[in-house]
UniProtKB/Swiss-Prot annotation:
GO CC terms: cytoplasm
Signal peptide start-end: none
Catalytic reactions of this protein: tRNA(Thr) + L-threonine + ATP = L-threonyl-tRNA(Thr) + AMP + diphosphate + H(+)
Name assigned to this protein: Threonine--tRNA ligase
Lineage, uppermost ranks: Bacteria, Pseudomonadati, Pseudomonadota, Gammaproteobacteria, Thiotrichales
Amino acid sequence: MINIRFPDGSIREFEAGVNSLDVAKSISPSLAKATMAAYIDDQLKDAKDAINSNCELRLITVKDPEGLEILRHSCAHLLAHAVKELYPNTEVTIGPVVDNGFYYDFSFKESIGEADLPTIEKKMKELAKKSAPVSYRVVPKAEAIEFFKAQGENYKVEIIDSIADEQMKIYTQDNFSDLCRGPHIPNTSVLKAFKLTKLAGAYWRGNSDNEMLTRIYGTCWATKEDLEQYLNMLEEAEKRDHRKIGKVLDLFHFQEDSPGIAFWHDNGVRIWRQVEDYMRASNNKYGCSEIRTPLIADFSLWQKSGHASKYAENMFATKSENRDFAIRPMNCPTCVQVYNTKLHSYRDLPIRMAEFGIVHRNEPSGSLHGLLRVRSFTQDDGHIFCTPEQVEEEVILMVQQCFEVYKDFGFNDFAVKIALRPENRIGDDETWDKSEQMLKNALDANNVSYELLPGEGAFYGPKIEFHLKDAIGRSWQCGTIQLDFSMPQRLGATYIDKNGEKQVPVMLHRAIVGSLERFIGMLIEHYAGNLPLWLAPVQVAVMGISNNQDDYCKEVFIMLEKNGIRAKLDLRNEKIGFKIREHTLLRVPYLVILGKNEQEQKIITIRKHSGEDLGQMSVDDFCAFLDKQIQAKE
């Protein structure tokens, strides 16, 4: 007999060889039905793995994040199974879980398009209803290679060859087998709420020199209600797509001459300036001085900073006069150079620097997505140089600033996470231990709840992440606060302590809105283009019922501009209904409509974008009304 301890501290006795599914059944049939896998002594295992010794057990159900991930990964296998049934000559490659779903890459021998997805989805449903048990076997590497080679799965053979392990797991459901680390669901019958969403091209291993594969995306949920809710959200997200709205509002465009880099138009720059000016004022409030540093630096600087060894594949390089240069992918190394121009005492610290720094990163062309994923962007970077004793206080101030900024921009629902050390990193474990604990202490001191993200920190230090929830429930990773003991040391940053000794300052990296391009894209989608008055590129459109009011329209327009209102004058010889409709489609918050009566009485008639009539008032009263709304960030 063995003893199994549960999360509530209770201990129960079972026969050796029992599995997690059996344990769940002994508690309740409904729990067994919901069980996807289990943590056995903190190791995630398949629900049917035998338990042969005393252990701690935590059952994973579809309600747990891990359970939903397992469900989606298993659905990717179901997709591959269906494809092999319908198109037997197809080679399967990889099928990972992604946000809200999964994808699988295939090498089809025939042409496949979006129109084929319903057929594949129908086959998936047929296979799921078979309630096929899902099992695995562990085989030597050579045997796995022979198994997949016999099936003509050359991509699987290549994957196995690239894995250092000598033992491979092969999962099987019905007549389909796939290479996978697992775990997977116990039975295909739990896959009931899924849908294939789109089809795209993808190079094998992300390398454009390799074969172009067909990538099929899908989504999978615990219940049909959850699936329906997600599909409704996708439909709403399509309406809010910043690329479409950006075109309608004439904000920006992209073209192949400069892939992944936006061309900003007048209206887009107006929004940009509001975001940048707001952040500049916020930085001033929190004691940051503003700097500006070079876009290009000698490659030796990036070698010293660690970027050359850890980030080279994302960097753009160039040569001049027999020297190697790199376009900066991050602003921090050049900021340190500003710090290093002076001798600093501990009394000078903390020193807070802010920069709206343009960076370039060589993102794969297939990953580019409007303003949300670009190759060139401007970061609202801040770098704070401080003593170890000042870290927690500085982080607390940064957290307060982040909360303040997000609320002003209309994001009131956000989560805080700490991304911990990744495998590919610089610095020793002792330094990482200290860094991670400092961030935890700062959040604890501020009574901020947070989630830990193992392995997701930057290569030079752990970071606090801010995830904002938008109007339709999507989560966006936005600002970061990163703690760095390594870079200031590598780049020779020092200060003189109270004993007259040289010390290396702690460097705090922070971005609040992050990429301005991405943040503006988020704002457009969050508000569906109906930006609040203080951010709107055009706040008021002035128009006359006929050309007889042109002079009065100009007079009102000038008065609005003198009061700092971003106004547009529409004197076109068009019907007033046409003008109202056009400016409504352009999401202008307020329309000023002037006719003979308004001209004679020197008043204005105001209509909101929503169609609500605000009646008549003087221009001065209207300006005061607008100013109050702008100051309140409404």
